[in-house]
């Protein structure tokens, strides 16, 4: 035997159900943006005029672009990153070279901090809870490689891309007793380069 319900109860029940369906649709629709990984990032090409010569290898970097990570893979809070194409060549040398993230430093005269964390992206860790970046780049003799270099600027509550549009940014590479400096006058500018 069926029970009768009032019109008011019927409308409240169907309204709540419709609201739940709409909310789940919105959450499903935005899930991809919050689970973003750097897999699909494309870095701007490097300018061949900006190459620095270390004697046994050359290095070059393109202009910076920006990416904000997912809190899912960053311990609960999203991070801001700069990234750029980074090219290394040993084409005119019989030697191979390995460059580590520790050979590179980032500085900004406007006070923003950043740490070079990756020379290419590997994927997620086995638990699917954290990004895994390559911390070194090895280039064999008479060879060349281009990877995406990643700079972690910190959490979104402590860093801002906006501050990088003013002031000067530098990326410094120290290797083989030499120091190369790539200088950016703004976030969207190609760098100038020098070596000593």
Which residue stretches match the model-derived regions?
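Conserved functional micro-motifs across diverse proteins
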Residues: 2-4, 13, 31-196
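N-terminal export signals
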Residues: 3, 9-30
């Amino acid at each position: 035997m069926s029970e009768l319900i009032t019109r008011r109860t019927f409308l409240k029940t169907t309204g709540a159900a419709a609201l739940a369906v709409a909310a789940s649709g919105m959450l499903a629709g935005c899930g991809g943006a919050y689970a973003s990984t750097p897999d699909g990032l494309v870095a701007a090409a490097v300018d061949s005029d900006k190459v620095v010569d270390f004697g046994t290898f050359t290095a070059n970097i393109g202009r910076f672009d920006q990416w904000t990570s997912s809190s899912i893979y960053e311990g609960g809070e999203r991070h801001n990153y700069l990234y750029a194409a980074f090219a290394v060549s040993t084409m005119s040398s019989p030697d191979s070279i390995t460059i580590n993230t520790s050979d590179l430093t980032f500085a900004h005269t406007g006070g923003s901090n950043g740490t070079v964390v990756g020379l290419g992206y590997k994927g997620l860790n086995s638990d699917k809870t954290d990004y895994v970046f390559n911390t070194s780049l090895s280039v064999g003799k008479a060879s060349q490689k281009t990877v995406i270099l990643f700079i972690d600027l910190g959490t979104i509550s402590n860093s801002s891309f906006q501050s990088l549009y003013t002031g000067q940014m530098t990326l410094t590479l120290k290797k083989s007793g030499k120091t190369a400096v790539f200088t950016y006058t703004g976030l969207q500018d190609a760098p100038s380069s020098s070596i000593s």
